[in-house]
């Protein structure tokens, strides 16, 4: 390895701040638009209020100082954390004040979770359904009850205490946000010291975070859950601190506790295998992962992250330098490789954010898929509404993050990219062969679209003609997903073979036996067939189109053959000015706008597939003799192979619960279903009409106001083209999300 040159020697880390850089002035903040000279003058037209909202958090437009932008972002993060703690506090408070948590804890299979009781004002107390145990309330599907049980919370008092703790943390975060902007604001070099930042986040946030959670799981969750699992009532379980200070109490449950730390220091770690296990599979009592497995997992992660937090070179001259690692990365086809990327990532927060959003979005989608295959908390697997809600939620979060990655990648290209500093490096070479990338991606989209859709069209046609023997199906022309089935089989065979210490498979989705809790299926092998093969290629198609739109937007955000000077027009512009027809929807912003619709397409197909597949092939009841009867009786394999099947046997058949919900505790979902359709339809008014139409209409209305001498002082203006599109896509997605939410929950709460 090359010795670092003098330029690359790591600067010593020191905490450097500016004292009292910005006054705390309520007078200034009280003036709307104080952050912009133009907006601070006040409104002349109605466009002002739109620009106020668009630019309030666009720190780039408020100052050209990277240090000042960094400080604003840093301070805003504390504000975000304050909101999160406030929200957490509210959740715990609802659990303490309005929920049936303790009743649920004593009978989790017979009582449904509820944390909201609707007050009777105009008859809406109809929403308080009977959730069992004599409690009337709204059934909740957030998974909080299961998480609280896994944490070892057994009383409302503990929930109250945590809620108060959350409020305290929120106040602390608000103070920190103010303090680090107005009193002691970090200098730019502090924000740019990536080695120190990586060390602290890896060791502190992830390492100590995992260690703390592992400690909590070992000392509190495990003993309390062991007692709950064996039927001890929550009221009889000792208080949490008893388990911390009374070693004899712990030793009764986990004998190795009587040996203390001797096995640890004598490296005889196997002694601790009574509470740090490697069982695999699910706890047959709760249908969740073994808590001793998850404690072991978090302890192992803590060790890894604490080690990783000592990996980067700061004040001691040992360890990695991020710049050196990046610049050493040179492949045979990548020219100067990663040269210049360090400078990009330390001076462009948009570039940094784009990568982080892509990673976090992908991670959220991975979480969605793990949470049903390996249900992490006790009794969550048999709470079907919660399982469906959490899958849908994490898919949506992931989708928005991934599109956000495309957005900020384009903003980086327009605002922060410097061609002179990126000659022949990886980014430059990607941009130079963008035509090949985009045209290949386009070909893939066309291929996937026509072939996957073509399979469905073929099946619909054959079924219409009564030629079922000529259809693609498990009973005619089979298209089995052989690679997926092979992956399932190697995971099923792993325990005792390639995973010699595991007692059971990582997930029963791969194979194995049916795990049932309270006569309901928690998890069982998911058989994959022709219907899955077909819909998976629809997933591939919609995801690739989303990627095509976002990647094209990013690669062509500075210039294109059509508009060579795009970078001068900015991130969002409606078209290339008068006299240039056919240049609409080419800005980076417009690609994000279009990408959002395809993201919605992708996720709708994915969550519909999940919802139907689980109801058809996994979720259901188990008879005393062990027979499983699924909610929709296994109709997925034969119905999901035609478009008509999706429309008739999924959308229409399963919408009956939401459509017929009036007069029942689920009637709110019927109203939401209706209202969200309305919001969605409202969006089309913005998406399908031009600005001129509205400007003409407004001028007539203003004329009428002038006629009767009630003309407004602020001149009304139609929305700009971009504003109209923004309002349109926002209502389109909101309407779509609301409709899907009501459709899913009314259905699954009724039948699940």
UniProtKB/Swiss-Prot annotation:
- Give the note describing cofactor binding and stoichiometry: P700 is a chlorophyll a/chlorophyll a' dimer, A0 is one or more chlorophyll a, A1 is one or both phylloquinones and FX is a shared 4Fe-4S iron-sulfur center.
Annotated [4Fe-4S] cluster binding sites: 575, 584
Give residues annotated as binding phylloquinone.
Answer: 694
> Any one cellular component term from GO for this entry?
chloroplast thylakoid membrane
Locations listed in the record: Plastid, Chloroplast thylakoid membrane
TM stretches of this protein: 73-96, 159-182, 198-222, 294-312, 349-372, 388-414, 436-458, 533-551, 591-612, 666-688, 726-746
EC primary class: oxidoreductase
Report whether Metal-binding shows up as a keyword of the record.
Answer: yes
Q: Which InterPro entries match?
A: PSI_PsaA, PSI_PsaA/B, PSI_PsaA/B_CS, PSI_PsaA/B_sf
Catalysed reactions, as listed in the record: reduced [plastocyanin] + hnu + oxidized [2Fe-2S]-[ferredoxin] = oxidized [plastocyanin] + reduced [2Fe-2S]-[ferredoxin]
Q: Where does chlorophyll a bind?
A: 685, 693
Q: Describe its membrane topology.
A: Multi-pass membrane protein
Chain residues that bind chlorophyll a': 677
Q: List the disulfide bonds.
A: none
Q: Gene3D superfamilies of this UniProt entry?
A: Photosystem I PsaA/PsaB
Query: EC number(s) for this protein?
Result: 1.97.1.12
GO molecular-function term, one example from the UniProt record = chlorophyll binding
Q: What functional role does this protein have?
A: PsaA and PsaB bind P700, the primary electron donor of photosystem I (PSI), as well as the electron acceptors A0, A1 and FX. PSI is a plastocyanin/cytochrome c6-ferredoxin oxidoreductase, converting photonic excitation into a charge separation, which transfers an electron from the donor P700 chlorophyll pair to the spectroscopically characterized acceptors A0, A1, FX, FA and FB in turn. Oxidized P700 is reduced on the lumenal side of the thylakoid membrane by plastocyanin or cytochrome c6.
Similarity field: Belongs to the PsaA/PsaB family.
Q: How does it assemble?
A: The PsaA/B heterodimer binds the P700 chlorophyll special pair and subsequent electron acceptors. PSI consists of a core antenna complex that captures photons, and an electron transfer chain that converts photonic excitation into a charge separation. The eukaryotic PSI reaction center is composed of at least 11 subunits.
Protein name as catalogued: Photosystem I P700 chlorophyll a apoprotein A1
Identify the species of origin: Porphyra purpurea (Red seaweed)
Q: What is the lineage of its organism?
A: Eukaryota, Rhodophyta, Bangiophyceae, Bangiales, Bangiaceae
